[in-house]
Amino acid sequence: MITGRELLRKEIERIWTIDRSEVIDHIYYYENRALVLRQEHYNMPGWPLGETEKYTSILVECFDRGGWFYGMFDDEKLIGVAVLESRFIGKKEDQLQLKLLHVSNAYRKSGAGKRLYELARVKARERGARQMYISATPSENTVRFYQRRGCRLAQEPDPELFKLEPEDIHLECDV
């Protein structure tokens, strides 16, 4: 049975047990203020090399300053996670970043991703945000997932996040 709950700090490293594998056939690029879809094939076997080491400390810091971490479980197995940053960003400081949203490969298209996204959106609104900011992996499936939920290209990409992830598609959505 699939259940959900907030994660504990000591469970952050369990995020890396999520099966991030994916076959990608199309990638979006941001060019001249528009999205351009290009055919490119990648077989992603899991988390990129070095990503777990790089991001564990970033996620722990996010947790320690009040970030919201929510996991979906199949019995005891973590199969999906959403992380909402607690620091406000944006020109008007009215956006919260959806720092992470991943669902294990076998559980995609099951509704788990939609549920995690919706819970994060509600949590952002409860915390006083007007919008959620998303730096999305540029794969067609990821970008379309967010577009189906009303996300659109960020009017003004966050300079810090854009510098960290210039290849990502920077999106925002009203909460």
Q: Where do the protein language model's features map onto the residues?
A:
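Conserved acetyl-CoA-binding loop-helix of GNAT-fold acetyltransferases
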Residues: L100-V103, K109-V122, Q147-R148
